[in-house]
C-alpha cells in the first residue's frame, strides 16, 4: 500500500513539475516569437451597416457577418497556413466584442462569435503558432478615458474579460491575452492628461485582476497591458504608467507591456518620406528619426520595463507602401532595410513583434497589405517578408 501511495505521490509531483515548466514567462514567450503577424481589419470590424464609432453594446442585425464587413474575405485554415508557411510563428487577432454581446448587463458573448474565434485560434495552434487575443475598437471603452466613465467602464471590462477568460481558459500558454488597445480621446492622438493616464492604469489593473481570478491556466497566463494609446512615449516619459500588481508569486514574470510602433509616422504611416536610414540619405530626403533613434528607444524600453522583469510586445508596426515611378525598386529595398533593422534590434532585446496587415494595397498612406486575402493569400509585399527574414537572421548573429 505504501509503495502505491509513494508512486501516486511521485506521479503527482512529476506532473506538477511538468506543469510548472510548461508555463512560460512573458519574456520567454516573447523571445520565442520569431515573427508575428496581425490579422487586421477582420474580427475587429463593426457589424455590417453599423457606425464604426458606435458605442452601442449589443448584437445588431448581421453581427455574425462582421468578419467581412470591411471588405476582407472569410478567414480559413488556408489563411493561417499561408502566414505560417511565410515564416511567421505568431498571430495577433484583434477582436471587437461589443457588437456580439447578447446580454449587455452581463457582457455575455454570442456563442456563434466565441465559437468562431475559437476555431481560428485552433487553426493557429495546429500550426504551433502563438496567439494574442485582445479587445479592439471597443468604442465605449477606448473613446472614454475619463473619470466620469471610469467606474462603469471598469465594471464592464471586468465582465467582458471574465467571459473571454472563462471561454478561452482551456488553451495552453501559447495563447496570450491583451487587455485593451489604443485608448484615446476621440480625434486626439496627442499627449494625454493625468486623468486619461489614470483611467488607462485602471483598465490595466482591472484586466489583470479579473483574468487571474478565473483560475486554471489563467493564473500564470501571459497577460499584456498597454500604455495610453499604445504609445510608449506616454509611459516612458510622463512617468504616470503604473505596472499592474499581479497576484502573489507571479511578480512581473507573466506580464508584458504593449506598444505600437509606426515610427517615424511620416515615413512608416503617412508616406511623406520615401527613404529612411543612414544608407539611403544619398537618394533623397529622410526623416530625422533614424537607426540611432530606434536603438536608443528600444534600449529605453529595456531599462524602464525589461529590467523590472516585464516582457515587451510591439503589438503593431508596419510601413505603408509608397513609391515614385522609376525609384520603386529602391524604395521597396529601403522598406526591407527598415524591416530588417526593426526586427533585428527588437529580437536582440527579446521583444516580440507583430506586423500590421490590413489587406490594403496601393501607393500612399496606410497601405499595410502584405498577403492578398482576396487572391488566395498571395504575397504582394515580398520586400516586407524579405526584410523580416533578414532581421531574424541578423538577430541570431553573436553580438
Which residue ranges define each predicted feature?
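Bacterial Sec-dependent N-terminal signal peptides
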Residues: 1-23
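Active-site mouth of glycoside hydrolases
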Residues: 27-222, 227-237, 362, 374-388, ...
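Short loop/turn segments at secondary-structure transitions that flank enzyme active sites
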Residues: 43-45, 263-265, 359
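Short conserved micro-motifs at the rims of enzyme active sites and ligand-binding pockets
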Residues: 48-49, 267-271, 324-326, 365-366
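Structural motif corresponding to alpha-helix initiation and N-cap regions
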Residues: 73-77, 158, 295-298, 336-339
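Catalytic domains of carbohydrate-active enzymes, especially glycoside hydrolases
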Residues: 74-96, 298-308, 343-345, 349-352
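Active-site region of glycoside hydrolase catalytic domains
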Residues: 151, 155-290, 297-320, 348-354
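Aromatic-rich peripheral "rim/lid" segments of glycoside hydrolase catalytic domains that contact
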Residues: 324-399
Amino acid at each position: 500500500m505504501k509503495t502505491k501511495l509513494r508512486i501516486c505521490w511521485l506521479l503527482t509531483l512529476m506532473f506538477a513539475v511538468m506543469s510548472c515548466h510548461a508555463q512560460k514567462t512573458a519574456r520567454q514567450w516573447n523571445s520565442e516569437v520569431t515573427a508575428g503577424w496581425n490579422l487586421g481589419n477582420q474580427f475587429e470590424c463593426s457589424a455590417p451597416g453599423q457606425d464604426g464609432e458606435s458605442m452601442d453594446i449589443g448584437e445588431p442585425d448581421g453581427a455574425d457577418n462582421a468578419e467581412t464587413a470591411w471588405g476582407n474575405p472569410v478567414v480559413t485554415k488556408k489563411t493561417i497556413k499561408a502566414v505560417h508557411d511565410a515564416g511567421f510563428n505568431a498571430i495577433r487577432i484583434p477582436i471587437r466584442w461589443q457588437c456580439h454581446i447578447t446580454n449587455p448587463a452581463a457582457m455575455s458573448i454570442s456563442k456563434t462569435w466565441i465559437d468562431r474565434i475559437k476555431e481560428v485560434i485552433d487553426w493557429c495552434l495546429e500550426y504551433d503558432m502563438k496567439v494574442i487575443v485582445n479587445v479592439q475598437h471597443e468604442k465605449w471603452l477606448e473613446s472614454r478615458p475619463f473619470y466620469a466613465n471610469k467606474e462603469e467602464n471598469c465594471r464592464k471590462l471586468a465582465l467582458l474579460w471574465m467571459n473571454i477568460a472563462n471561454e478561452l481558459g482551456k488553451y495552453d500558454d501559447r495563447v496570450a491575452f491583451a487587455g485593451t488597445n489604443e485608448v484615446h480621446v476621440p480625434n486626439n492622438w496627442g499627449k494625454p492628461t493625468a486623468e486619461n493616464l489614470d483611467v488607462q492604469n485602471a483598465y490595466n489593473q482591472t484586466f489583470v485582476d479579473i483574468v487571474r481570478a478565473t483560475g486554471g491556466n489563467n493564473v500564470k497566463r501571459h497577460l499584456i497591458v498597454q500604455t495610453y494609446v499604445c504609445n510608449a512615449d506616454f509611459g516612458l516619459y510622463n512617468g504616470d504608467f503604473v505596472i499592474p500588481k499581479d497576484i502573489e508569486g507571479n511578480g512581473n514574470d507573466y506580464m508584458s507591456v504593449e506598444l505600437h510602433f509606426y515610427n517615424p509616422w511620416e515615413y512608416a504611416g503617412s508616406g511623406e518620406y520615401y527613404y529612411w536610414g543612414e544608407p539611403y540619405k544619398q537618394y533623397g530626403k529622410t526623416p530625422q528619426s533614424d537607426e540611432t533613434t530606434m536603438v536608443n528607444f528600444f534600449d529605453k524600453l529595456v531599462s524602464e520595463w525589461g529590467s523590472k522583469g516585464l516582457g515587451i510586445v510591439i503589438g503593431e508596426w508596419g510601413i505603408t507602401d509608397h513609391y515614385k515611378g522609376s525609384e520603386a525598386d529602391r524604395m521597396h529595398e529601403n522598406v526591407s532595410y527598415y524591416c530588417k533593422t526593426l526586427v533585428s534590434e527588437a529580437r536582440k532585446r527579446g521583444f516580440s513583434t507583430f506586423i500590421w496587415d490590413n489587406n490594403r494595397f496601393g501607393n500612399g498612406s496606410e497601405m499595410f497589405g502584405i498577403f492578398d486575402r482576396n487572391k488566395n493569400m498571395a504575397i504582394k509585399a515580398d520586400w516586407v517578408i524579405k526584410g523580416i527574414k533578414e532581421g531574424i537572421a541578423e538577430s541570431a548573429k553573436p553580438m
